[in-house]
Amino acid sequence: LSQAVLLYSKQKPYLEGIIYNKSHHITEPDEKYYVPKASEISIDTGLKSKLEVEEHGIKIGSPVVYKPQSVEMKNDCIAGTSVDDRAGCAVLLELARHLKKRKSGPTVHIVFSVQEEFNLRGAMSAAHQVRPDIAIQLDLMLATDTPETTEYGDMILGEGPGMSLFSFHGRGTLNGVIPHPSLVNLMELSAEQKEIKLQRSAQVGVLTDLSYIQQ
């Protein structure tokens, strides 16, 4: 609630809006700790009528996203909109710059997939076309260095990249990934040679495109 959003329309790249929040002065006690459903949320764009909304190209199904913002914090930390998985995109772009300089080596395909959060099928078409021998997925890793998350693992923000040794959705789909031991050894050896801290993780409730790429 009270979050800035962007509504994409045909007339402009977007319209700015705010998720409507009932005034604190008229909020009932039982409403103050209630999380509204998506169907109960309204967005105020400043437009005064249904006709005005339609004239600006806003229709049922028009995309709405949170307005991007970012904050630089201490110790090289950042907070922002959609860091999952723009951080992964940044890593891949830097990788592409390094690969461009090499003279020889195996073929590397870099894929930026879509709809991973929605149905996990965004990377499947690329996998069917490329048919890779090895697939490496870059995605978020659940940090467990705050008081309420310590029971879920030992992943500390800023202590190096994390390598998933086990992932399983566990909520409605029997799918996950256990990486091949030889690839795990390769990652650990490479990290050791480059003096890169490498953390390890095993999680239930986490699923990425890699679960479907391997099919």
Say what each PLM segment does.
Residues 1-215:
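N-terminal hydrophobic/helix-forming segments and targeting peptides
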